């Protein structure tokens, strides 16, 4: 292969520039195409999105005052909360990453930065949707399990809606957003075991005490897929058609499945001319969706819980059971997409690349989709087209 300018590549260089290379000592097939930046060793970076004060304009403060006050009629509270929801959540930045294009050689690369949401991640989209549903149905308390980001989002949404919030966290995790969650008025309960154990406890409490269950899966799947589908509509609003591919970091698979559902709706209504390929990226050997895709499994298969280890970088991505894994796997395969792994080091390095090149401070785990996209471009040079990477959280 030759360079774009006709000169041959030096040994060890890739056909798409020198910004990335395969991790040393690991087979390309084993890593699922994982990439490493050619920079120094990664430094520890916190997993949770950065906590920042939530400052609303006076008119929205007035809406929150109505939504959170039980003295107002339910219809007025719902309207006020919806006004805050529509104003503050979603409609996040989509911008062309020209500097990363120059680093990698992949042209027409767009970054969809969901760190612009109130608590800094895409989880605000589903948290506000669930709080809206809870308020409409007459609940006074919402509950969910979390390792940090969803708990912060749900606690904020509940406080705006005048709802109590109980968040269940796995005792073995260091929830760095705990002070923020409590500051929003939520009650935190530690649960022995992993995230899945915390989900089970939250659901049991919801059933026994008649609380609103805001956990992913089950009856909430439709609500959450619709909420994440808004990402697709926002991309369409900017590009006026579907990109060639959309790359997303995955954990439970809900965000990816929702984005696919949104584009499918646009395609069926004749708004877009094609379905984008759906790409998944996640932590190395710690996510059932990527593992199942690479192994060729027909359905999303659980991993061995004893082999899942949390780090300061991979926490937003890891689990042994992906709640919406089957939906995510179907989205990848039905669009002829792909999935690959990302190591902690590569995610930390790409986080620094996004910061230095495009001025966005992102969670390292948010770059797993970008890594998966560039891995495929390294192996099989992608066509000159438009590509979107969803960056799910700010640092």
Question: Which residue stretches match the model-derived regions?
Answer:
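PLP-dependent amino-acid enzyme catalytic core
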Residues: 2-395
């Amino acid at each position: 292969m030759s360079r774009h300018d006709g000169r041959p590549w030096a040994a060890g260089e890739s056909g798409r520039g020198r910004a990335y290379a395969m991790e040393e000592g690991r087979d390309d097939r084993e890593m699922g195409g994982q990439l490493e930046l050619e920079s120094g060793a990664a430094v520890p970076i916190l997993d949770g999105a950065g906590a920042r004060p939530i400052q609303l304009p006076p008119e929205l403060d007035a809406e929150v005052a109505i939504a959170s006050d039980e003295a107002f009629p339910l219809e007025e509270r719902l309207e006020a909360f919806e006004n805050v929801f529509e104003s503050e959540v979603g409609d996040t930045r989509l911008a062309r990453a020209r500097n990363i294009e120059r680093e990698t050689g992949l042209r027409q690369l767009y970054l969809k930065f969901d760190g612009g949401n109130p608590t800094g991640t895409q989880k605000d989209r589903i948290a506000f949707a669930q709080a809206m549903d809870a308020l409409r149905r007459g609940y006074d308390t919402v509950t969910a399990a979390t390792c940090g980001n969803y708990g912060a989002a749900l606690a904020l949404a509940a406080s705006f809606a005048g709802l109590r919030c109980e968040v269940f966290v796995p005792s073995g995790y260091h929830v760095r957003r705990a002070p923020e969650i409590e500051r929003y008025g939520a009650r935190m309960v530690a649960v022995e075991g992993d995230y899945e154990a915390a989900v089970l406890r939250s659901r049991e409490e919801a059933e026994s005490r008649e609380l609103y269950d805001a956990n992913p899966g089950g009856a909430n799947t439709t609500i959450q897929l619709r909420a994440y589908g808004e990402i697709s509509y926002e991309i369409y609003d900017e590009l006026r058609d579907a990109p060639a591919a959309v790359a997303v970091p995955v954990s439970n698979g809900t965000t990816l499945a929702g984005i696919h559902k949104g584009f499918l709706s646009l395609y069926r209504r004749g708004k877009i001319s094609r379905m984008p390929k759906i790409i998944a990226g996640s932590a190395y050997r710690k996510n059932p969706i990527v593992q199942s895709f690479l192994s060729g499994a027909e359905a999303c298969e659980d991993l061995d819980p004893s082999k899942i280890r949390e780090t300061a970088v991979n926490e937003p991505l890891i689990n042994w059971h992906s709640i919406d894994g089957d939906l995510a796997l179907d989205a990848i395969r039905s669009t002829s997409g792909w999935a690959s792994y990302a190591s902690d080091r590569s995610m930390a390095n790409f986080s620094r690349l996004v910061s230095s090149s495009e001025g966005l401070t992102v969670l390292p785990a948010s770059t797993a989709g970008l890594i998966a996209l560039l891995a495929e471009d390294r192996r099989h040079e992608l066509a000159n087209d438009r590509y979107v990477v969803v960056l799910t959280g700010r640092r």
